Amino acid sequence: MSRGFAELMFTPHVLALQQVMGSRAASARLAGFDNPDDDRLGDGEKAFITARDSFYIATVSETGWPYVQHRGGPTGLLKVLNDHTIGFADFRGNRQYVSVGNIATEQRVSLFLMDYPNQRRLKLIGHARVVDAATDRKSVV
């Protein structure tokens, strides 16, 4: 866990609850695990990301409510574009366009990637943007 992730997720109320429940020391050790100024994807994260055949994406609606959607496809559906950026093709899906619509007004997202057989996971937070492959080919290649 990077310190940046912990700073965003461990709000004052979360920290207080960790203290009350006795997990604050362990959480503090995890929060300092990585270089605090380094939010780049490392080789381990990159390998984990590209080995996935599905993930969950959470977006925030205009009403402020979270929305979680599963995305699946062939292994490698998530592409590591650089040390700070991943991408994926959003296939037709259920044609409700809730995630894409949410991203149009609120770019904050959370991705949850799971390796079920090995009981490993990776949580990512960031900002998303929708790129139309038909009109902005350079951005997606």
Residue ranges: model-predicted function:
Residues 1-141:
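Binding-site signature for planar aromatic cofactors or substrates
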